[in-house]
Amino acid sequence: MKAEIIAIGTEILLGDIINSNAQYLAQELAALGIDMYYQQVVGDNEIRIMHAFDEAYSRSDIIITTGGLGPTDDDITKEVAAKYFNKELIQDENSIKKIKDYFKFRERVMTKNNLKQGLIPEGATVIKNNNGTAPGVIIEDDNKIMIILPGPPKEMKPMFEESVKPYLQEKSDSILVSRVVKILGIGESAVAEEIKDLIDAQTNPTIAPYAKDVGVMLRITAKAETKDEALKLIEPIEEEIKNRLGDNVYATEDINIEEVVARLLIEKKLTISTAESCTGGMIASYLINYPGISEVFLEGAVTYSNEAKHNRLGVNNDILNKYGAVSEETAREMAIGIAKTANTDVSIVTTGIAGPEGGTLEKPVGLVFIGVYVQGKVTIQKCLFKGDRNKVRLQATITGLDMLRRILIK
């Protein structure tokens, strides 16, 4: 069974709105074992929407549309669908009542054009919308299925989850299950080289590498009749990848590096502090994304100036004068200083040049020294990151967290 997504709306076509619905629906369809090879975006124009329907049904069994269910004249998805299937638009009394109740409850005046949203193609199944006024519909005709959903994600997603997914599950004879392998420390090309034979031999499961802003993710996907059967296909491939890539694999579930580090700190009952210069508090901010981090995170300091490094962390002025703020020596003193003054077992520190100005031939933009202190031992890593200011800060943050992870798992 093949599906195709059609996003309807001139605002999407012009780039005024990001089509996040397509990403969500693609992932959900894959999880249901429904193949999808095409997506379309079309403006609010009857002829072009009709053409999009023709194109989709020439290669797919199911069309899922989003958008064009509002009360205005350019919201024409249901009208075009009714014409396409040669059906009349009729009033759905339950939908009309719900629309009226929606406005009455909010003490707002309902204009006549809102009643347009209660019209559905004759014979269609109504999909209730508990978060807005536009119901969706399912049309089945001559072995064709069309599922029409509203554009706002806060309305579309619950409708898909509560009504469309169970409907599609009954029609699918298999499911897709995916697991992710998250990697730091080596690039996409190096990862691909390490597992080239696995990628070349893939059938079921499949292996798909993705380069992220920082790091690489592999998605392993298997198709089977049940989830357990799919997982049995995935597990040996996942284990082989972990064996080959070693400590570069930081997670085999969809979690971020800060959550991995937070879990390790809590598990080992190690307290942590941070002192950041070029990252400006980003490491601390990432860590406190994790609920429960307050058990171990005691303090975060942003020590941007030399004075702050000296006064708050106790970095020796002689070291600052001799080696400069951006140096291995300063990073070492920062790591020791924040751990000592905050009385923590662990610390992460950064000092560097994020740019776009401030670099020299000796110390270019992107140069960052990252220090990790763990119970008396300091590890320093010299890094040269590429990209704009925010990219440098992000790479330094992720690298610092990954340095600590690698130490804690030894």
Curated annotation (Swiss-Prot):
Signal peptide: none annotated. This is Putative competence-damage inducible protein. InterPro entries: CinA, CinA-like_C, CinA_C, CinA_KH, Competence-induced_CinA, MoaB/Mog-like_dom_sf, MoaB/Mog_dom. The gene is cinA. Pfam families: CinA, CinA_KH, MoCF_biosynth. Belongs to the CinA family.
